[in-house]
Amino acid sequence: YGANVTVKDGAAKKNTAEISGGTVTGNVYGGVLTAVAATKNATGGSAHITGGSVGGNVYGGAITDAAASGNVTGSSVHVAGGTVTGTVYGGHNAGTGTATGGIVTITGGHMGAVYGGYTATTGAATTGNTINLGTADTVTPAGTVTAAGTPVAAGTSIGNIYGGNQS
């Protein structure tokens, strides 16, 4: 966990989890609200996987309780290596709120399905989510390329890809 907020009125903001090796048997969360009926938001959480093995899912930001009313916004995941047995979520909301602005960037590794944003509630917004396969070149306003981006590594494997999804 970058942060695990267990109080109803607590918020998770700009927390990061990094995995570079070893084995994680459960889930990895950048920032997560696990309180029953949480009312605040999980904002800007991030998870970075560069090696090792994750036996569960990877979440940039998440709210785990179905009775929660907060939103998951601006969360991100970068997978550059390693293996994720489960699913990768930029943002995941099991409550009644939204999962918006999630970004997943994949430059390597092996994983199951990938979601930019996911909500468990029909009608809850999953807008503005992005999945990047590789990273972009840096371009100046004049149009000059100043740094090469990172392509997806050879041998990378990904299951299904979803920009946003409502349960």
Predicted regions mapped to residue ranges:
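Surface-exposed loop/turn motifs in large extracellular/passenger domains
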Residues: 1-27, 32-57, 62-87, 92-113, ...
